[in-house]
A protein has these predicted regions:
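Central regulatory/effector-binding core of bacterial HTH transcription factors
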Residues: 89-151
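A late-sequence structural motif
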Residues: 244-294
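Acidic, Gly/Pro-rich loop/turn segments at junctions of secondary structure
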Residues: 125-180, 231
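Hydrophobic hinge/microswitch elements
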Residues: 127-128, 146, 199-250
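Alpha-helical linker/hinge and terminal dimerization helices associated
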Residues: 42-43, 64-86
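Secondary-structure junction motif
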Residues: 177-205, 209-211, 266, 280
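Short helix-boundary/capping micro-motifs
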Residues: 10-28
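A short LG(V/I)-centered, amphipathic sequence patch enriched
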Residues: 40-59, 76
Length: 295
């Protein structure tokens, strides 16, 4: 089977059309069409319905989809490991949302690299949607992300919920009524509980969908924002930021998601997860917890 054609098949499904697949693969649409035709001829089945509204799976395509991610993932692993330098026996591709790198992401990466000297590691940043797509297609072995749902041939490991605390560049900032309040979008459940608690606070003038961006802005400008504790803690420790007293502490679910192949292959994975869970135990002694999201 032509692995390039199979990867193209997966990219068509990921993007929803042959045109977008061509853009993502940086090839012409005719090349994408030719690769798909090659795969269909090899299998003797039509795999994708080509429609103006987009590409959809045929029954045969749905059956192939059960195996395609595993096939491409195994090939990628074989390719990576056969090219490893002497002394390295395996490779792990890891992905993490940027807002989680400072806590669970970095803790996992450090554990793997420090305890497994024969392991080659690569790290990749992406949105939650990108990461789940990449692990589904075999491009990644393990991811740390928010609000994950395990698909077939994947195992989900819940991690301690991420604490979201109200931080400010000033002491004694009001909980409600700060004209420089920055709204950070931490997901649908957070938006719901935030709206319940701050129902009479009005609409924030500044909005970010990245806690990292909000942090960088807050370090250079007056204001307040809900940030993940793991991200804000270094700046709290050196008094560059301050926790707003008595503000509710929200929570957001996060998880480590691994392909079943990775679970079987990396015998140290559960120890790494236990290390993260121990390192990120709830810190109720540092701030009151009055509101919750994703619990």
């Amino acid at each position: 089977m032509n692995l390039t054609s199979l990867q193209t098949f997966l990219t068509i499904l990921e993007t929803g059309s042959l045109v977008r697949a061509a853009d993502k693969l940086n090839v012409t649409q005719s090349t994408v069409t030719a690769r798909l035709k090659t795969l269909e001829e090899e299998l003797g089945q039509v795999l994708i319905n080509r429609q103006k509204s987009g590409a959809t799976l045929t029954p045969a395509g749905a059956k192939l989809m059960r195996y395609a991610p595993a096939i491409t993932g195994l090939w990628r692993q074989a390719k990576n490991e056969t090219g490893l330098p002497a002394g390295l026996t395996s490779a792990c591709s890891f992905g993490c949302e940027r807002d989680l790198w400072h806590g669970a992401g970095r803790a996992f990466f450090h554990y793997a690299t420090s305890t497994q000297p024969e392991l080659a590691m690569s790290a990749r940043q992406g949105s939650g949607r990108d990461l789940t797509d990449w692990i589904a297609t075999g491009s990644l072995d393990i991811i740390v992300t928010f609000d994950a749902v395990a698909r077939a041939s994947q195992t989900l490991y819940p991690l301690p919920a991420e604490e979201l605390i109200l931080c400010s560049d000033r002491r004694n900032t009001p909980i409600i009524g700060d004209p420089n309040y920055i709204f950070v979008d931490h997901g649908a459940e957070y938006r719901r509980v935030h709206a319940e608690f701050y129902h009479d606070a009005g609409i924030a003038r500044l909005n970010f969908d990245s806690a990292w961006w909000a942090l960088q802005y807050l370090l250079e400008n007056p204001g307040s924002a809900y940030l993940p504790r793991s991200l804000a803690q270094p700046y709290l420790d050196k008094a560059a930021l301050f926790i707003v007293p008595d503000a509710p502490v929200f929570h957001r679910k996060k998880s480590l998601l691994a392909s079943d192949q990775a679970v079987e292959k990396f015998h140290w994975l559960e120890k790494a997860i236990a290390q993260i869970q121990s390192h990120e135990r709830p810190q109720h002694d540092r701030a009151p917890s009055q509101g919750q999201a994703g619990q």
